[in-house]
Structures are given as structure tokens and as C-alpha cells.
A protein has these predicted regions:
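Substrate-binding groove of N-acetylhexosamine-processing glycoside hydrolases
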Residues: 1-15, 22, 36-234
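Short acidic/His/Gly/Ser-rich catalytic and metal-binding motifs that mark active-site loops
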Residues: 25-30
Length: 234
């Protein structure tokens, strides 16, 4: 709570992201303090413990007039109830498809869509460093096959879409622009677009027409399609 006090003093945002993803419960199951807390609070298991802790932190933020964002992992299973100031960020399409999205909507939680297929711009265009063909994507994949593209008309609980570029797995500064551009243009088009999108060929033509402008602004513009990348593209 001391940390949240400091965060709230520093950042006026209505939303505070509290994480909650990739918390394997093996160590929790063996931890005497965790087992003691589970027993004391009459919780079912370690996942329920995470929900309980998440609820305490979200409630604390609620007292400050803030909303708490959690990664979708916290609602893979039902358990200890979360308060009504919670927003779920759905990310793990690769591991759990739309489980977090469905569970969030079922519990009436607003959702931010930002799946690792195809909004994680650290994922390469072509296979690289253990990223197999299944974990690559190009401009066309984003535009036509992005599971995060859920128009708000589909469900009023969908707040919108996010994108990320994680740099913890070998992505260097020199790679960043070419990972971001032009794929982020397809994401931007989906984020602000309403109604039926134009066909991909028309969109692709517009992207190519803007490449020189981006380069004149100092950005490195990567290949748009996998077939344009060649075998040495990073």
C-alpha cells in the first residue's frame, strides 16, 4: 500500500496497472506464509490467494478513486471476487486463446485487448532466436488476423486495444523502428476505425505511399510482408 500511495502521488491517471501475469503457483504452494494466509482467509488454493491479494490492492485503489488493471491471468479460474473497479487486460492468446476475454465479459469486467498475437511488436517478422514461424507476423497478419481487433460494437465492455514492444529477449535499439513500422500502422487503423475496414490491398497501398515520409522523419521502415523480408532480416 505504501508503494501504491507513492504511485498515486506521482501519476494522476485514473488507471493503475497492477500486473498479475505469469505468477506460477509452485512456489506459492510450498511457501509456509502463503499456506498460512490461505488457511486464515479460508481460501481454496494459491490462485484464490492471488485473487484475494489482487482484491485487497484494487479495493485500496478504489478508496483513492482509481481503477486497477490486471492481466487476464487473474481470471483464468473463478475464485475470490474482485471489486467493481477492475479492468482486465487480455494478452495470452498463444497460451489460452480468448479465455480471459470470455471470463472478463462473463463477470462484467471491462477489457483492454492486447494479445501476444498480433500486437506484441517484439515478435519478429520472420523466424528469429527461437521465435518459430507460428510466432511471427507481418502487416497482413495484423490487418486480417489480429484476435485483438474487437470493435466496441461487439461488446460495450471492450474498452479498446493496446500494443507493446517488450525488449527483454534480445531486441536491441537498432531493431526497434523496423519492428514497429509499418506494423503499428495496421494496429492504429484498427484502434481508431469504425465500420467495415477497407480491403488489405487498398490499405497496403496507403502504407507504401507513406514510407518515404516516415523515413524523412528519421524512422527506419521495415518490410511490410514476410516475402519482402529475405532470410537475413532481424
Amino acid at each position: 500500500k505504501n508503494v501504491l500511495d507513492e504511485v498515486c502521488r506521482m501519476f494522476p491517471s485514473a488507471y493503475i496497472h497492477l500486473g498479475g501475469d505469469e505468477a506460477p503457483k509452485g512456489n506459492w504452494d510450498k511457501c509456509p506464509d502463503c499456506r498460512s494466509r490461505i488457511e486464515k482467509e479460508k481460501l481454496k488454493d494459491s490462485h484464490d490467494l492471488q485473487l484475494w491479494f489482487s482484491a485487497q490492492m484494487a479495493d485500496y485503489l478504489k478508496q483513492k478513486g482509481r481503477k486497477a488493471i490486471f492481466w487476464g491471468d487473474v481470471i483464468y479460474k473463478d475464485g475470490y471476487p474482485l471489486p467493481d473497479n477492475v479492468v482486465i487486460q487480455w494478452w495470452n492468446w498463444r497460451g489460452h486463446r480468448d479465455l480471459a476475454l470470455k471470463n472478463a465479459v462473463r463477470h462484467n469486467y471491462p477489457v483492454i485487448c492486447g494479445t501476444n498475437y498480433y500486437t506484441y511488436l517484439n515478435f519478429p517478422l520472420t523466424p528469429w532466436k527461437g521465435y518459430t514461424q507460428a510466432r511471427t507476423f507481418d502487416l497482413e497478419d495484423v490487418y486480417l488476423r489480429n484476435p485483438s481487433y474487437r470493435p466496441r460494437e461487439e461488446n460495450p465492455l471492450i474498452l479498446g486495444m493496446s500494443s507493446a514492444l517488450w525488449t527483454d529477449d534480445g531486441v536491441t535499439e537498432s531493431m526497434i523502428d523496423r519492428r514497429v513500422f509499418p506494423r503499428i500502422l495496421a494496429l492504429a487503423e484498427q484502434m481508431w476505425h469504425s465500420g467495415n475496414p477497407e480491403n488489405f490491398d487498398e490499405f497496403y497501398g496507403k502504407v507504401l505511399s507513406k514510407q518515404l515520409w516516415f523515413e524523412q522523419q528519421g524512422y527506419s521502415f521495415g518490410p511490410a510482408l514476410k516475402e519482402d523480408a529475405g532470410t537475413n532480416y532481424k
